[in-house]
């Protein structure tokens, strides 16, 4: 695409807040990352930059922020060359929030504000006035003395955004700001962004892999393989999928929705995408279709037309650029079809009804109760979701289940083993994939797999055979000699899951496994998980992405260490249009009830 003017009429192109002119960026060993990017952005616009892992989004954001010089081309900020004599001055016009929020975690909230105020050269009066305003805007006033490293993920996100806004920039650049953040915090962030874009005449550019967020923006730019492919409004991009979007429901609800979804998404001839939604599956067909054709293909399934979304349009366009991602996923499924039954454990097969049993589960850190009297059971082959806001107690519960944290009080059995007394024995049966992926970044992909295989007792020819299997299954063969730390996020996710599955665990624990992953990576990942569960592997997963809760057989929502609701996704969602709405309703109602209780007892 040679020239894109976002939010500008032809006679106003010269008034752009930010402009790229034939921007390229190459790096040694990685080749060309960005190629010929030309675009102009108007003020007072909210712009989404979307694309797959490795598309070049972060590189373009860092170039715009003045911290990574392009190999060729020009970057203009309000008509002036950014990488020239006025670099320092123009950088102050831009607020930048990187993926890790850019916080100093050993400093308190107040100290982070003071440090950023000093870096921006603000006066004492300006610092106090703006800090007060931003603390109120982000609801962080009560946490000024808390170290940033001890804030929940949602609070860190808000603090990072507040620090980026402290200088009152005219351009705000946010690189995947909601990764690992719960729906309540995401809602608050987008409220803040919309208010600032309108009130301060500010250009805001958000890099994201979440299409529901991109749909909230005025304009969307699709970046793939370093090229700017398409730009338009969310509505104009959605129109690329007109005539291809349907909703599918079982006429007799005999199977979980995720199994219907798994059946449909395997149809690479007729369907391009299939995602669980409410009581059925949201479909995207390969080319235009109609209800009658689909009914003939799938007897017993009822189809209705639905409006196309930005995500639908993006997937149609992406197939034109990069082909069909699902073909690779289909080739790798054989590994997962056999994984669960290869080394069947008598403790599990002998007690299929309850592989995990938790009763009155409590975890204390000193006087602080992180998990308070939690009860649940998980069956063999079940996908069980742990949901909750940042700081709700999910990860603490998760670590107790994995034997990584001692249980303070209550009962906990995993695969028939009392975890309170035999944590090491229980861990031998488990696979664990953490949200930070638990990889050794300095080791190559092959070295990571060899290390973990040895840790699981897979040595010699048996270990080599298993490593070869997972390299092929996860599409990692071409990356075998590459350092794990240099992999794109989606490939780090693949490697992390590969290490967790090397020893064919009977129970798989996944802690926010798709956080920040692009759409194909998420779809591919859940195909693997569904195949594992179908063949008997028990899966426990935490996620902040509510669409993924619909892949679960049952979900437990926690907040402040307490269990709020346990049931099927359909039961939890009852009365709400989406799982996002249901999650927010459950948590806010519980918080209001707790606030009322405290008033009554005070």
Report the location of each language-model feature.
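Conserved ABC ATPase "signature" region
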Residues: 114, 118, 125-143, 450, ...
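The feature captures the beta-strand-to-loop junction immediately N-terminal to the Walker
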Residues: 50-52, 387-389
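Helix-to-loop junction immediately C-terminal to a conserved catalytic motif
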Residues: 65, 402
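ABC transporter nucleotide-binding domain
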Residues: 192-287, 527-541, 546-592
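Conserved ABC transporter NBD signature motif
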Residues: 73-83, 89-90, 410-418, 425-426
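Catalytic Walker B motif of ABC-type/P-loop ATPase nucleotide-binding domains
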Residues: 172-176, 508-511
